[in-house]
Every structure is written in C-alpha cells, then in structure tokens.
Amino acid sequence: MGIKGLTKFIADAAPNAIKEIKIESLMGRIIAIDASMSLYQFIIAIRDSEQYGNLTNESGETTSHISGLMSRSIRLMENGLKPIYVFDGAPPELKGSELEKRGEKRQKAEELLKKAKEEGNLEEIKKQSGRTVRVTRKQNEEAKKLLTLMGIPIIEAPCEAESQCAFLTKYNLAHATATEDADALVFGTKILIRNLNANATSNQNKNKNNSKRGYILTEINLEQVLKGLNLTMDEFIDFCILCGCDYCDTIKGIGSKTAYNLIKEYNCIEKIIENIDQNKYQVPSNFRFQEARKSFINPNVLPKEDIKIDWNEPQIEELKHFLIKDYNFNELRVTNYINRLLKARKVTTQRRLDNFFTACTKKSTKLIVEETKKEQTLPARKGKKRPTAGDKNKQKAVKRKIEQANANGHHKMKEENKSVDNEKNEDGIKSVDNEKNEDGIKSVDDEKNLDDEKNLDDEKNKDDEKKSLDNFSSNLFDSDKESESGNIIKNEKQNMDDEKINDNLPSLFGDHSRIRHTENKDNISDINNNNNNNNNNSSSNNNNISNNHFNSVSSNSTFNSSTKLKSEDTLKSNSPLKEDSPNSYNNIKNNNHTININSQINNHKEPISNNNLNNINNSTEIKKKNTLFLLPFCPKDVTNVKKKKYTQRC
C-alpha cells in the first residue's frame, strides 16, 4: 500500500522533486525493480483488450505473469536499461495487522466479483478482479526461473523488497528503484521511478491514451523532496508515519497537510502527541510509531557483501523447453522473444556518455611510488621515445613560463636601468657642474699665471739682450783686456746659449710664422750686405783706429758673412722648419749685433751718414717684429697642461 497520499502531496508541496522522463534517459542505468509489484501488475493488467481475460495454458493455469515479465524485460533491455529484480521475503511482524485487513478486503471483493459476473457488468468485473488478485509463491518461483534462464540477475530480500531496493541505491549498486509503493522513499531510496511498465516507452507522449497518470513515466528525487519540504530525514519519516503506513495505525483526523504542519511545529511525533487536542485527534491505543520508525531507519536487508549481481548468458535450449513444453507457448513466438533478447543484450553493453566525462581522481602517493618502482625495474627500450600529447603540452607550458619569466625580468631590468640612468644623469649633472666650476676657477688661475709668466719671460729676454749687447761692446772697445780670439770665443758661446734657448721653445708656430721667417731672412741678408759695405768703407777711411779694432771688425765681417751663408743655405734646403727656426733666429740675432756694433763704431769715431741711419732704423724695426713674433708666450711644461674643451691661444 505504501504511504497514503504521499505522491500527491509531494507534487503540490515540492513540485521540483517530481518530473516526467523518457525511457531513453535511463540508458545504461541499473534499475532495481520490485518483482512482486511487477508480477501483480502483470496479473491484473495483461489481459485481452476485448475480454480482459488472463492468459492461461491448456490446464487453465495463469501464464500472464510469465509473458508480461519476459516481454517487459526484453523491452527495457532494448532501451539500454539493466534490470535487477528483487523479490519479497517473509513479511515483517508489524505488517501482520495490515495483512489481516487486506484479507478481509479481498473476501469482500470476491463477493462483488460474483455479482458483477452474474449481471455481466464488465467494468465492475475489471475493478473487483484486480482487488482479488494475489501473487502466489508458485508464481514467484516461476518468475525467478524465467529470469535466471534469460541471464537477468535476481535478489531475494529477507523482508520487504522496497527496503532492499532502497539500500541497493545507497550502496551505489543501482541507480534507482522502480516500484509503485511510495514507502521506498521512506526507506531512503535516492530516486524512485513509477509506471515503468510496457506502455512507458519513448513514444509515450505521442499516444493520446497515454495521457493518463498511470502511463506516464515519472521520477521522484528524494533530495529534492527534502529540500522542497524543508525537512530532515527523521522528520520526513515521522511525517510519513502520521500520513499512514503499513506498520502502524494512524491518528484519526490527521491527513498529509495536518501532519506536515504538526511536524514543522513540533519536529517529532512525541511532542505532537503531548501538545495536540486529545478530544479532536484520537490517538489509537496501540500506536506503535516508534517500532515503525525503527523499521524504516534500520530495515532487515542483505548486507553489501552478500549481494551478488551476475549478468550471465541466456540459456537458449532450457528457455525454449520452459516456455514451449511447460507452459504451452507458441514456438514462433518463443523464437521471436529469444532473438530480441540476444539483440537487446548487445545494447545493454553500450556505455553512457556520462561515463566518458567523469572527473579524474588524483592518484595516491603509494600508487605513484609503486609505478615509479615498476618503471625503474623495466628495461629501457631501444630507440628514441616519441613525445606524447601530454609531453608536448608540458613542454609548451614550460616554454610559456620561461617566456613570462623572461618578459618579467626584462621589464624589471628596464625599470632598474631607467632608475640607474636617472641616478647617473643626476650625478652627471652634478659632476659636470662641479667640474665646470673647478675648471672655471682653474682656467682663471691658469690665465693669470700664464700672463705673469709671459711678462717675466719678456723682461728676462730684454735683460739678456741688454747684457749681451753691453758685454759685446765692452769686448770691442776694451782692447787691453781681451784679444780678438777672446771676442770670437765669447760670441760663439753666446750663440751656443741662444741655440739652447731656442731648442727649448716648442714648435707652436704655424705656416704663417714660417713664411714670415723666410721673409725676415731675406731682409736681414740684404741689410747685412749693406752693413758690410759700410764697414769696409769706414775701415778704409779711418786710419787712426788701432789694429785691434780692425781685427774685431774683420772678425765681425767674417762672422756676418758666415751667418749670411747659413741663412741662404737654410732657405735653399728642404729640411723641416723646426730645425731651421733656431738657426734663423741666431742669424737674425747676430746680424742685429753687427748692426748695433757698427752703429756704435760710427757714433764713436765719425758722424753717421744718411745711409747708416736708414740701415739702423730698418734693423730696429726688424728687431721689434722679430721680438713680437719670435717670443710669444708658451708654457714651459707642455705635458702638465690639461686638455681643455677650447683651444688655448698662444
């Protein structure tokens, strides 16, 4: 009987828990079927469409349960289902009173059936015949033998078949329970399937006659029921007991709605009994709700270790003998069933798409260690190992990580270089400013020092020239002290000193200075010729001058002629001007000495003529030019001078 009004109440209070399904959605699923309920359906439902009579053999025995069970099983297997039939065992003690009530109802139904047959009322015959139907033990044994020959597994429950089916789903040995009794939900089945009969096929929605509730394949999900009703499993069990079950009587006046409200308010039957109005709700004296609760929570079922589910090959010859000889089935019909059975078994071996998308579980460390040991013990194969798809993916992942790391490192290096460049620029600006300030101070000091040194050098050169002239004149006019040879030696020493001074001068003169040197040499040579002529004239005219004076003049004339030759030779030679410059300077200086000496002699002995004055003036101008040009400022130690950004002017 199950729970009174439970399916209707769930449809109203928790509609998301019930849904219509197609049989194709159960492909590849193991379905635990209540065999006693199926046999009952076959006995009352498989009838002739016109007479509603049971199928019988020659001796009058009913064979509808055999025909119906075989045809339904083959149809389920053709749709990809894997049925497991569970048979009832001994009924529980709590169900004794319920069985007595069912016996009394069956007797009344038999009496009504006789009257309907006498009257010929077909509708009443159909109605009362269903109430009088009872599945016998013999029918159960015949069904077990048929399923075994077909190779379909069966389970004999120690007690209720619904409770055993529910625990198969808990053990994950079955996907759902197929029965019409709603008490399978109270036993804890995860999914309950109703109306899994011969008419519940994939074409059920196309047939108008199948719009009736009894022919619609429905599925009830226990988890969604509890969620929709907002109850715990213990509260749901107490709620079902109050609604009415096979194990105890019910409280009069309490239906499914009242029971639900009381459970939501008091959470258990004990508190409900304490708080309800006893005058309004009569509690039965033998209300064994606690025992009923225990039978739902801990039913008598087979443990998981004792359950054996074996899919065997069908026994064709034995099956033919059982159907044809024992129960007088048509041979053609039997061969048709057997052929369908063999084809259906191939369909059940197909896997669901869900199995191809299951979540991958991680291996334990023990398994990984064992696998690595096995790999190490295996001998290495010859040849190169081809990279698998997983290896390629790993290599790509490693490359991506390396590229990301390089990109991040390059970005960091750029940022560090930028910071370093900024610091360098700041330090460089500071250092440049400091260097500029220091260079400015040093350049000012160097310019001052250079000017001072220039002035000192000019003064020294002037003093040296004066001293040389004075010494030379004294040597000329003091005949008692020095001889001609002494004068010549002194002049040679002075020339040597001048050459040393000129050698120390750096080669800082450009092309223009070299040209000026050559021009001055030409002018000086002409002047020397004139001076020599004048000196000869003066020597011939003056007879009162002593021999020493003439000797000195002659020596000077020879010296002047030698200097003239030197200057001409330097002009003709192609030697570098660096080597000629000191000689030219000495020649110019010696010529100047002779000019001064001759001028002094002329001033001392006789009046100066116009030619002599012109020569003297020319020599003084040349002397000024030479001193201005030949004695520029230049630092003594060129190596110690720092390199400047600008060129130093001489």
From Swiss-Prot:
Mutation effect (T388P): In strain: HN/FCC-1
UniProt GO BP: base-excision repair; DNA replication, removal of RNA primer
Region (N-domain), start-end ranges: 1-106
Pfam families attached to this UniProt entry: XPG_I, XPG_N
Function, in words: Structure-specific nuclease with 5'-flap endonuclease and 5'-3' exonuclease activities involved in DNA replication and repair. During DNA replication, cleaves the 5'-overhanging flap structure that is generated by displacement synthesis when DNA polymerase encounters the 5'-end of a downstream Okazaki fragment. It enters the flap from the 5'-end and then tracks to cleave the flap base, leaving a nick for ligation. Also involved in the long patch base excision repair (LP-BER) pathway, by cleaving within the apurinic/apyrimidinic (AP) site-terminated flap.
UniProt family annotation: Belongs to the XPG/RAD2 endonuclease family. FEN1 subfamily.
Protein name per the record: Flap endonuclease 1
Name of the gene encoding the protein in the UniProt record: FEN1
